Amino acid sequence: MNYFELFKFSPAFDIDTALLAERYRELQRAVHPDKFANDTEQQKLLSVQRTAQVNDGFQTLKDPIRRAEHMLSLRGIELSHETTTVKDTGFLMQQMEWREALEDIRDSADPQASIDALYQSFAEYRAQLTQQLTQLLTSEQAEDALLAADQVRKLKFMAKLHDELTRVEDALLD
């Protein structure tokens, strides 16, 4: 299913999330199972299925990584259940540096400053990746779609690393 069509958007990485939320509420009102309480069982089931599609579409389009994955899946590139790893040596080196910095936080003289520095580093790198991804996703070239898939893999890794950093920060606050 093309969630961009469902929510009446042109496929694009940058979308108006406020408009997405508005259209989500409209679709929810239109397909909500309560509207079909007095209809046939088939209509009720169809309503439940449509509600699930609307919910999944909203969750997909509101999350930038899932939105990019969806855009790529519409072009025949499935990333959601893959195990392909990033082969970019520069990114792998950066990844190792971040992991080392993450491990060193507990022994740091100023753990919060180390955490803040990592968050800043993540934000800067993520902004670069996102800018490149936006450009690649607008291209119709097959090789650009493959490069976009690599950017998504990197962003997924960074999201996991960000979650780890948040857990370390939470543990230090406890």
UniProtKB/Swiss-Prot annotation:
Output the InterPro entries linked to this UniProt entry: DnaJ_domain, HscB, HscB_C_sf, HscB_oligo_C, J_dom_sf
Keyword check for Transferase: no
Record's GO cellular component, any one?
iron-sulfur cluster transfer complex
Pfam families (alphabetical): HSCB_C (PF07743)
Q: Which UniProt keywords apply?
A: Chaperone
What positions does the domain J occupy? 2-74
* Gene Ontology MF terms: ATPase activator activity; protein-folding chaperone binding
* Gene Ontology biological-process entries: [2Fe-2S] cluster assembly; protein complex oligomerization; protein folding
Question: Which domain of life does the protein's organism represent?
Answer: Bacteria
Q: Record keywords: Chloroplast included?
A: no
Instruction: Give the protein family.
Output: Belongs to the HscB family.
Assembly, in brief, is: Interacts with HscA and stimulates its ATPase activity.
Q: What is this protein called?
A: Co-chaperone protein HscB homolog
- The record lists the organism as Shewanella baltica (strain OS155 / ATCC BAA-1091)
Origin organism lineage: Bacteria, Pseudomonadati, Pseudomonadota, Gammaproteobacteria, Alteromonadales
